[in-house]
Amino acid sequence: MKNYINTDKLIKLYDDLVQFALDDIVARIVQNEAITGAAEFRIWKLQQLGIHLEKIKDYIKKMTKFSDEEIENIFKTAGITLYKPVTNLFIEQKTNFPLNIEASQYFRDVFSYYLSSTKGTVQNLTRTTAISSQNLLINKLDQVHFRVVSGIQNYSQAISEAIDEIGKSSLKVVYPSGHQDSVDVAVRRAVVTGVNKCFSDLNLIRAKQNGYNHVLVSSHLGARHIDNPSPEYLSHDIWQGKVYKVDWDTVPFVKI
């Protein structure tokens, strides 16, 4: 039996991200009459997503009414050129991607990860346990998750916008256990945890594909400490900042 793949949801996720980035670029150009550093970065990201530079220019022209000459001068002043992907920086890895999206290998890996980790539904990317009836929350979290993973928006911007939008129609987020959280707490937790999980899984996948057997776990000040924890990993300061050998036979993997 062939696995179900919700291509409509995947395409919508992609289209929403592209449209968000294009509108943000236009707003910054109109405000500054130049391409700012943030706009330049988003143009670079859009090209990685498979959007040709000329398509980006056409959209800017359509929305700003600038002439071709004005747009070319703006891009020339900013020094923006056609994106050329860097290959073989790591061992080249191909994925069987189900959609005809000419994105960079990183984004194709992210999309494939979404498909595998959600069993093709591309739903609830942050793995929030909020009750399924809270569709506005779950759909917005999916959108925000992809904006952060893609690099189009940073954590604070994405979380702030999500809280503003969701907060207009929902005062509390309810979980199956009956526990309730305020919108800002639920959104922040879901986005940060979901993005970290995505990056962690992709790093492990790439490490295994490239034949690496050791990992260095990051560390930070103020890590949780528990006296005589059971199990031991509950006290984070015990295991952070160390090198570990990975037993790949025991690690559960999402395949991409």
Regions found by a protein language model. Give the residues of each.
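Domain-core detector
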Residues: 1-255
